[in-house]
């Protein structure tokens, strides 16, 4: 691979353990390991707790440059920008947070414009508005502008009523359309999202799904023996939700299902993670006087594979409004460990098609508490070995980190634009 200078502008980055920051960190690490010269403009790590990690202390109030070294000795330059991190990430506070990063990153970009030229500038949405900085660099210095969409942030804010002002939504949609029209390459993580993005910009959109390291996350034999490590009996049936605890998941349904199953002493519900709505769930647990629900902190990466193997059933929940606006990143890791997931997804969405086509999970309608409860009851007493094997097979075939990154960037790094266009069909055939 030809050595290139690559700039990533993103609101989340390593060492954030989950979500977009995790994928941004792994992507840049892989690119650096291929011999590329990589720079990152980002925030201080704050997600999913919505609190800057304590190791950064008071440094987070000003700019900081770090150097990360990958295994081949190649350095990654990371420029961290100060930004507002709200304790209560409401719709308004999230907007303020993102725009505070936008303006602090803008100052960094003013300096980078006078440095050695980057061949590619990648911005990852959300935050969607960072694409404006990609356009700025492209117009002044040239190079390819790549706009990758992890969440259809504006659509989700509208459909989930996170932002209720139509004026603000329309302004944001106009900015998004402007960014999409100026991007050289647009990509996103699911087939359903590709269709939605294509309708916005009327141009080709590449498939760049989230991935998993299938060598790090794998099924463990005798996984029931791991349960005592986390305070459970070997005979307990563990229903696990592990991930961000936010508004778009509708996690209250877990607690109401637990209330209905209090007479099943062998069924235990574990909620692992952090997020702005965790306190609400803990309060609801206390209100319902639940003894079968356990809140666990984020697990360290070195034991995360064992932890995921503890679960008999995984929960992947989203409200109906989320639809094809987001694709839960936790699913790839669940599939890689051979986990069986109960997934809330509507017919016609990418998530529904993925799960149903591979016979590797149990599908229920979003926002249907009765259907979720029935699925849990039926699943814990069923033989699900085939579902588990199908999940692992799907991950090995479709979600391998090296395969996805190599396939995608082999297309992106085509020197001539007509070469990129001619490779789109090949990319889809490889990954889809």
What are these regions (language model features)?
Residues 36, 212-229, 250, 414:
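Acidic anion/phosphate-binding donor-loop and adjacent secondary structure
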Residues 1-66, 424-432:
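N-terminal subdomain of nucleotide-sugar transferases
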Residues 189-192, 211:
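Carbohydrate-associated surface elements
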Residues 56-63, 218-232, 388:
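A short helix/loop element that forms part of the nucleotide-sugar donor recognition site in Leloir-type
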Residues 249, 297-307, 312-335, 341-353:
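Nucleotide-sugar-dependent
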Residues 367, 385-412:
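A charged, aromatic-enriched C-terminal amphipathic alpha-helix characteristic of glycosyltransferases
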């Amino acid at each position: 691979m030809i050595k290139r200078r690559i700039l990533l502008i993103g609101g989340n980055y390593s060492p954030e353990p989950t979500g977009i920051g995790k994928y941004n960190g792994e992507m840049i690490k892989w690119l650096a390991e291929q011999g590329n010269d990589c720079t990152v403009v980002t925030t201080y790590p704050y997600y999913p707790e919505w609190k800057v990690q304590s190791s950064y202390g008071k440094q987070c109030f000003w700019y900081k440059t770090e150097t990360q070294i990958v295994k081949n000795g190649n350095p990654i330059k990371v420029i961290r920008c100060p930004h507002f991190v709200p304790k209560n990430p409401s719709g308004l506070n999230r907007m303020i947070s993102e725009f505070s990063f936008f303006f602090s990153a803008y100052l960094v970009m003013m300096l980078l414009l006078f440095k050695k030229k980057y061949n590619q500038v990648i911005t990852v949405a959300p935050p969607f508005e960072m694409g404006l900085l990609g356009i700025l660099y492209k117009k002044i210095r040239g190079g390819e502008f790549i706009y990758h969409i992890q969440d259809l942030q504006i659509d989700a804010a509208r459909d989930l009523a996170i932002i209720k002002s139509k004026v603000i939504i329309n302004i944001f949609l106009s900015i998004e359309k402007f960014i999409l029209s100026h991007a050289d390459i647009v990509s996103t993580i699911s087939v359903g999202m590709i269709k939605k993005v294509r309708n916005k910009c009327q141009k080709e959109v590449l498939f760049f799904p989230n991935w998993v390291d299938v060598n790090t996350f794998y099924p463990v034999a005798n996984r029931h023996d791991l349960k005592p490590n986390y305070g459970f009996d070997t005979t307990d049936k563990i229903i696990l939700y592990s991930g961000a605890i936010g508004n778009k998941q509708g996690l209250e349904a877990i607690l109401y299902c637990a209330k209905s199953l209090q007479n099943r002493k062998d069924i235990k519900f574990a909620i692992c993670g952090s997020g702005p709505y965790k306190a609400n769930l803990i309060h609801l647990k206390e209100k319902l006087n639940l003894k079968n629900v356990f809140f666990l902190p984020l697990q360290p990466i070195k034991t995360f594979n064992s932890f995921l193997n503890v679960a008999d059933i995984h929960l992947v929940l989203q409200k109906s409004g989320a639809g094809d606006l987001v694709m839960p990143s936790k699913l790839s890791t669940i599939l890689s460990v051979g986990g069986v997931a109960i997934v809330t997804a509507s017919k016609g969405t990418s998530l529904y098609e993925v799960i149903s086509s591979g016979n590797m999970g149990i599908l229920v309608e979003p926002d249907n508490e009765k259907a979720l409860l029935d699925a849990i009851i039926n699943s814990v007493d069923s033989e699900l070995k085939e579902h588990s094997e199908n999940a692992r097979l799907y991950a090995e075939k479709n979600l391998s980190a090296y395969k996805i990154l190599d396939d995608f960037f082999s297309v992106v790094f085509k020197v001539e634009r007509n070469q990129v266009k001619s490779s789109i069909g090949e990319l889809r055939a490889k990954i889809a």
